[in-house]
Amino acid sequence: MKIILFPLFVAVIAVGCATSKKSTAIPIIDTHIHLYDTTRPEGVPWPPETDKVLYKPILTEHFDKVSDENGVNATVIVEASKWIPDNQWVLDLVKHDPNRYIGLVGSLEIGTPDFKKHLFQLSKDKRYVGIRMRERPGGDAFFENKAVWADLQLLAAMDQTLDVLMFQYSIEDVDMVAKRLPNLKILMNHVAGADIEGKPADPKWVDAVQKVAKNPNVHCKISGLFQQSDRQPSPKDVSFYKSELDVLWEAFGEDRLIYGSNWPVTMRGGTYAEYLAVVKAFFADKHRAAQEKYFYKNALKFYGLPPLKR
């Protein structure tokens, strides 16, 4: 009898441990990936054909594999194309899997005559959660355009969010918008544009981060770490990034930091698993509630998304 029951007992224990491990894993929402199809007849405006790493179809079947391998439950796509029809193209592309592809940060040019029309139409789909400021038409005069402010006010009134790509915009720009429109939810992308060199963070950047973080409507994605590194392939040890990450943690705390990868651009610096390992290492000594907020709860709250279903 003992010989018969012993392997059964071991099997029950093994199943129990596996179930326990799965139940205690923290869900992950990746709030920053891009999808596109370079084989479309009309092509794509980004990435360029000269990009040997990124210029290939990047579609749901590719991210499905990445997310399953790395325990990513869901994602918010960020539209990298400046072509307006591509907003709907992405929504249609992912409609077969709404529990994995839960949101889209769209691409519409603020301050243009048709902005309102397109925003009204696209936001009828509840997965359309906001837009990203990427280009800066007019350069330094961009914020002198009254239409820009009217469109930003419209975003706030519609409870749509604003992601900001920190290449064309400064932290000071974000601070100005946040103060003028305190009801607009703003999310700075890619560690607030930090130049990461494996040494103490730039004092000017630190000062700007501390100032902008005083606005409660400003949040920050810890995303794009590999791209912000001054060396490629990107270092895989969290110590290289710790100076900037510590600044963001101290400034924004557990309630206003959000996880994103910037996949597939991450492939320039390393694998998805290597990227995720870096941010997990940084949060390893934080309490579980803070980890849960960073990896998924803050994203749900910021983008106004329903509870996870997978």
Please give the residue ranges for each predicted region.
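Active-site environment of divalent metal-dependent phosphoester hydrolases
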Residues: 36-39, 82-85, 111-114, 136-139, ...
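Mid-to-C-terminal alpha-helical segments outside catalytic/metal-binding sites
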Residues: 3-4, 26-31, 56-74, 246-247, ...
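Conserved, mostly hydrophobic/aromatic
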Residues: 32, 90, 104, 155, ...
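Catalytic pocket-lining loop regions of alpha/beta-barrel enzymes
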Residues: 129, 142-258, 287, 306-310
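Bacterial N-terminal signal peptides
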Residues: 5-14
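Active-site neighborhood of phospho(di)ester-bond hydrolases with catalytic His/Asp-centered motifs
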Residues: 29-31, 77-78, 105, 132, ...
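Mid-domain alpha/beta scaffold segments of enzyme catalytic cores
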Residues: 21-154, 158, 239, 279
